[in-house]
């Protein structure tokens, strides 16, 4: 299993990581069996999924708490652990983010808030260091929280050994350059799938130039690319899928027609459509890290199957042609 770099940090991991947003539960994901979630994280590490990603906002600390419980039973050296900072509900700030389960959440990328976030996360995660620290959402007005202050705080945490690599999520090319100007940026985490490819044109050229890695979240496009969604599948009122452009009738039909063309490949590689999509997604961008969510051991096993797929060059070209045809 080939490892790939996380920017210039010196950290290397397999391409597939485990996302733990769903483990946070709450109104977005519904109730969780935390004991199953702990087993899911243990299973991930056993299957060679080393990168475990979480965030304080996931379930308003609940995801971090569950990941921390799992870490009590896992060799820390076998895990690349990432979390995030910059979303605040301990106190009000000038930048409103949104309301989550009745709690008003703000953005705060001040040095003070970042340091507090990290200390709190270290405690919940039962560790003395984070392998990657992401800023979760950037502030629209850097006059309130200067980017230089944000990056300097993260560089200080790195010098102290509390974090090993610096990441940023939900960025622009200019913001990537800003991080690199004031310090170091190792990785960005962005939405990317076979249907959502803005990263390739808007961010990838800058990342290549500056040696910044990319980690993709939502690679299965909220389940649309698993092969389990049909044109007749409906979602309850309030579901984000109802507003996702990929789920609208015309785009959904394109996606399902594309997946239908790959039935012979699932037989050839003895895999599910979801596993095939994950494997292809990892090849779309050289060195791409792919983050797949799971909250049960079975879901982890399903995702982990993608690690064993070695696509033939001709098959990868054929599939990419199909993807390009609907892009």
Describe the predicted segments one by one:
Residues 8, 70-76, 123-126, 179-183:
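Acidic (Asp/Glu)-rich catalytic clusters
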Residues 122-141:
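Active-site groove signature of glycoside hydrolases
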Residues 3, 138-327:
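Beta/alpha (TIM)-barrel catalytic core signal, keyed to glycine-rich beta->alpha loops juxtaposed to Asp/Glu
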Residues 31-44, 110-124, 172-178:
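Short, acidic/polar
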Residues 9-28, 82-104, 134:
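N-terminal small/glycine-rich loop or linker at the start of catalytic domains
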Residues 22-34, 99-115, 141-143:
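Active-site mouth loops of central-metabolism enzymes
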Residues 1-80:
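N-terminal binding-site loop/beta-alpha segment at the start of enzyme catalytic domains
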Residues 13-17, 50-51, 78-82, 129-132, ...:
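Structural preference for beta-strand elements that scaffold enzyme active sites
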């Amino acid at each position: 299993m080939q490892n790939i770099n996380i920017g210039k940090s010196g950290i290397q991991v397999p391409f597939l990581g485990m996302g733990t947003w769903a483990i946070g539960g709450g109104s977005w994901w519904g109730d969780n069996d935390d004991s199953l979630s702990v087993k899911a994280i243990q299973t991930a590490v056993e299957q060679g999924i080393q990168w475990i990603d979480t965030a304080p906002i996931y379930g308003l600390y609940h995801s971090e708490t569950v990941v921390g419980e799992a870490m009590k039973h896992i060799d820390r050296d076998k895990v690349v652990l990432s979390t995030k900072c910059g979303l605040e509900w301990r106190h009000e700030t000038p930048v409103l983010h949104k309301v989550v389960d009745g709690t008003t959440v703000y953005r705060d990328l001040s040095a003070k808030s970042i340091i507090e976030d990290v200390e709190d996360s270290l405690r919940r995660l039962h560790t003395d260091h984070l392998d990657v620290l992401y800023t979760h959402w950037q502030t629209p007005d850097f006059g309130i929280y200067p980017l230089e202050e944000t990056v300097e705080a993260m560089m200080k945490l790195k010098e102290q050994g509390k974090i090993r690599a610096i990441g940023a999520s939900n960025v622009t090319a200019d913001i990537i350059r800003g991080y690199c100007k004031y310090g170091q940026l190792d990785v960005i985490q962005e939405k990317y799938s076979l249907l959502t490819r803005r990263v390739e044109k808007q961010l990838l050229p800058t990342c290549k130039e500056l040696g910044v890695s990319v980690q993709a979240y939502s690679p299965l496009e909220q389940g649309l690319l698993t092969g389990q969604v049909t044109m007749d599948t409906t979602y309850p009122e309030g579901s984000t899928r109802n507003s996702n452009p990929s789920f609208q009738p015309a785009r959904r039909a394109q996606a399902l027609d594309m997946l239908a063309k790959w039935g012979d490949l699932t037989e050839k590689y003895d895999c599910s459509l979801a596993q095939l999509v994950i494997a292809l997604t990892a090849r779309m961008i050289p060195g791409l890290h792919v983050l797949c969510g799971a909250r049960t051991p079975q879901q982890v096993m399903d995702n982990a199957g993608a690690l064993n797929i070695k696509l033939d060059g001709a098959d990868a070209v054929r599939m990419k042609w199909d993807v390009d045809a609907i892009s």
